[in-house]
């Protein structure tokens, strides 16, 4: 099957040089990146969390960029049949395909165009933040003048039905209060709040629904965008993805999840516990149904015993009360607005949030890097939080990212070393994730990609 797709969404014009950049060549990493992300988009809504399995299932899929005088078209060769209805591509997928093209081309151009950006230094914290801003601005995700109303929702892709229905109820309550949603774009706790908010917005006749899906090339195939996403944004790596979340958020809700959710919480606490951010207003709520109370108790104990009692003041745990979660978020929006106005910061992008370089620099989850993490208590808590975040990030890679899966197949499990008490609590937390099926989607046995060494 070969079909041609016209542009829809936020990109409809490419220069001739940009098209040539994406022309298929056997050695083109850029083409492979574009192809794999496009395939993930066309599998939107599919229940998989194994990027290697998805990519191998569609080995005969190809995509070409065709240059036309009036713009550009995409040629799809052997695409997934589920992306089409009566021979026509689903419009949301059509828009998301061009979002992939937009973001991958833009990031490549920003990084490699030394004429337009001669001084871009990706080892410089300020430059990294400006790149994150540029990607979001190019995606038209930063709406000037809009009052704060963007709630970022984090949580696992592999959650049980009770947790899914609860996250949907929270989303409905947020939607009834005309709040918009940003998630990691995949299934589970990333889809449920959007689904609930869509109903809430419809009930209120709210016409400006924004369901932002923020992803990255290395995970999009393991977590294909859910069908509710109407603004897909692809950040270059997990660190820039996390920074984008935090800088566009006016409030953050964390639902039950696995190692990826723990990584997100530790990343955020590493920022909020930095003394430079003591005046920031960013409400953070951890919530789930009553069946998840034990999950949050264990997570809370892990945070307190590794980062100290002071970490607790940066978040609130609300169990089994969807309306209260939404009320607290809505009540916080004027406070966020006042804080941004008082500091002269933008409503759409939090420039004043201080993010330490060790939270911004990409972490390569190699076996050597994982073994060399400094997981000891005799250091500033924000530094320990950053290394704990890296440890969980490596486990995410070993679980679902193609590069991590291949490394585990070749060299065996990651070995994680550190303080005996921290290692014991980390092992308890991870064993709980395994027992509760939070590492993999139900139906597939989980084989640990790590060993805790004490």
Curated annotation (Swiss-Prot):
Enzyme class: hydrolase
Null allele phenotype: Cells lacking this gene show a reduced growth rate and yield in glucose minimal medium compared to wild-type. They also show a consistent change in the level of several metabolites whose masses can correspond to adenine, xanthine or 4-hydroxy-L-threonine.
EC number(s) from the headed UniProt entry: 3.2.2.-, 3.2.2.10, 3.2.2.4
Keywords assigned by UniProt, alphabetized: Hydrolase
Top-level taxon of origin: Bacteria
UniProt GO cellular component terms: cytosol; protein-containing complex
GO molecular function: AMP nucleosidase activity; guanosine tetraphosphate binding; identical protein binding; inosinate nucleosidase activity; pyrimidine-5'-nucleotide nucleosidase activity
A Pfam family recorded for this sequence: Lysine_decarbox
GO BP annotations, alphabetical order: protein homotetramerization
Protein's job: Catalyzes the hydrolysis of the N-glycosidic bond of diverse pyrimidine and purine nucleotide 5'-monophosphates, to form ribose 5-phosphate and the corresponding free base. Can use AMP, GMP, IMP, CMP, dTMP and UMP as substrates. Cannot catalyze the reverse reactions. Is required for optimal growth in glucose minimal medium, possibly because it contributes to nucleoside pool homeostasis by degrading excess nucleotides and feeding back the ribose moiety to catabolism.
PANTHER family linked to this entry: CYTOKININ RIBOSIDE 5'-MONOPHOSPHATE PHOSPHORIBOHYDROLASE, PYRIMIDINE_PURINE NUCLEOTIDE 5'-MONOPHOSPHATE NUCLEOSIDASE
Family the entry assigns: Belongs to the LOG family.
UniProt xrefs under NCBIfam families: Nsidase_PpnN
Protein's name in the database: Pyrimidine/purine nucleotide 5'-monophosphate nucleosidase
Organism from which the protein derives: Escherichia coli (strain K12)
